[in-house]
Amino acid sequence: MASKAAPSCRLVFCLLISATVLRPGLGWYTVNSAYGDTIIMPCRVDVPQNLMFGKWKYEKPDGSPVFIAFRSSTKKSVQYDDVPEYKDRLNLSENYTLSISNAKISDEKRFVCMLVTEDDVFEAPTVVKVFKQPSKPEIVSKAPFLETDKLKKLGECISKDSYPDGNITWYRNGKVLQALEGAVVIIFRKQMDSVTQLYTMTSSLEYKTTKADIQMPFTCSVTYYGPSGQKTVYSEQAVFDIYYPTEQVTIQVLPSKNAIKEGDNITLKCLGNGNPPPEEFLFYLPGQPEGIRSSNTYTLTDVKRNATGDYKCSLVDKKSMIASAAITVHYLDLSLNPSGEVTKQIGDALPVSCTISASRNATVVWMKDNVKLRSSPSFSSLHYQDAGNYVCETALQEVEGLKKRESLTLIVEGKPQIKMTKKTDPSGLSKTIICHVEGFPKPAIQWTITGSGSVINQTEESPYINGRYYSKIIISPEENVTLTCTAENQLERTVNSLNVSAISIPEHDEADEISDENKEKVNDQAKLIVGIVVGLLLAALVAGVVYWLYMKKSKTASKHVNKDLGNMEENKKLEENNHKTEA
């Protein structure tokens, strides 16, 4: 009995000693685990053949041991100690590997695997490190706007539930922001939850912005340590509205200042290039030193030509920052004299003037009965064809809608004028009698036979054009007759007669009246003939001059030749006389 008790005593003593003293030479082993994962700790001791059982313990901060798991090598049974924080979380395998589910920060301890034989205790320590990835950093408490040249809190970067704690870095357009006195102020804080032991990191950024920061993205990141090493997580980008003062004022004129005409409404719009743009301005009208306070627009209604001038606007609190625009209110006046309906007598003179007054050169177009005229009408002696509806129209091409027009309806009146002609048909069986009538209003024509007073109704009339038309009858008189043509309008009654011989008696035919159109053709032909004659005369004159010059030159040459021949004759005679004398 005594011999059996001795080994048991030695075993208990060894367990007590090993609970406080780690056997040297086994070294340290670290297991890294992510928060919430299962911690797996192999027992790094070779299992001896005479193993009795294995145990796991951990050490408190004061070094005292806490046993948590036991496994017998003979009974193949597992027992877990009543440790509240590890209840239902432990699993000890046959090879004495200890697994702890749902890893927590409090699991960061030194665990020891103990394999016990009758003679010895073998131990292997394992250090557990638990890591918790922080939440994605977020920029919160963001400033609604930043102001240039003012140090202002931009926002806070926050990342939660980290273990161990991490570092926060700020970036502007992807580049790290370093603290700079008076321009970049970064304050970092961290806080640990007493229950979860997880850290929350917060970094606030105060920043003095410039206009270069417009549309620039700001981000932050958290750098932390995980089971596999160091990692970095970035926040979403944040872009801030940058407020900056107005540096320039501009003025706009609506509609376009090149197309303003009398009667238009003008809207002046003043703009500042600051952010936010100014909401109020002072507007200065031509000749008014005091500005009118208004929003960024000021409207003038039904403007007149005297509104032409320089318009200005400025900031309310900085009147020296001013902008101006020159505005011309275009106008167009037209005066037609005479105008309306005018009645004149044929042969009268009628001066017509269309006077234009405009803000710039205007185009003038004359129309007669909707047909464009080549030049302004001028009437020194009115004709019936001058009657019609005349329109003087003017416009400013650069200003849409600015045009004026006045009309003149000219009526040319005249008493009836009659001319009668007769012509025998080539067959000799009939005669054509024509009564040409001129006058306005249109005269009525009546044919009668003098003596009998009979009225001839079978007539043929031409169209009434330019105050003229004719009435024609065809007769075959067996005896001499006198025909009377009567033309009558509101002005007068005119009568003319023509003697017509019997069809059997030959007589001289009278030429037909030449129409206005034929007159123009005759005039054109006459002009052409005159031009040809003048051209021929000029050609003959030039030819005569050339011939005269030629003849004059020829006579001069003949004189020189005759003179030379005379001199030769005289010299010959002198030589002959000299020979005779010598003989």
UniProtKB/Swiss-Prot annotation:
Region (Disordered), start-end ranges: 562-583
SUPFAM superfamilies reported in the protein's UniProt record: Immunoglobulin
Cellular localization per UniProt: Cell membrane; Cell projection, Axon; Cell projection, Dendrite
Post-translational modification note: Glycosylated.
Topology versus the membrane: Single-pass type I membrane protein
Tissues expressed in: Constitutively expressed in the autonomic nervous system. Sympathetic and parasympathetic nerve fibers but not myelinated nerve fibers in the spinal nerve.
Function text: Cell adhesion molecule that mediates both heterotypic cell-cell contacts via its interaction with CD6, as well as homotypic cell-cell contacts. Promotes T-cell activation and proliferation via its interactions with CD6. Contributes to the formation and maturation of the immunological synapse via its interactions with CD6. Mediates homotypic interactions with cells that express ALCAM. Mediates attachment of dendritic cells onto endothelial cells via homotypic interaction. Inhibits endothelial cell migration and promotes endothelial tube formation via homotypic interactions.
UniProt-recorded name of the protein: CD166 antigen
Native species: Bos taurus
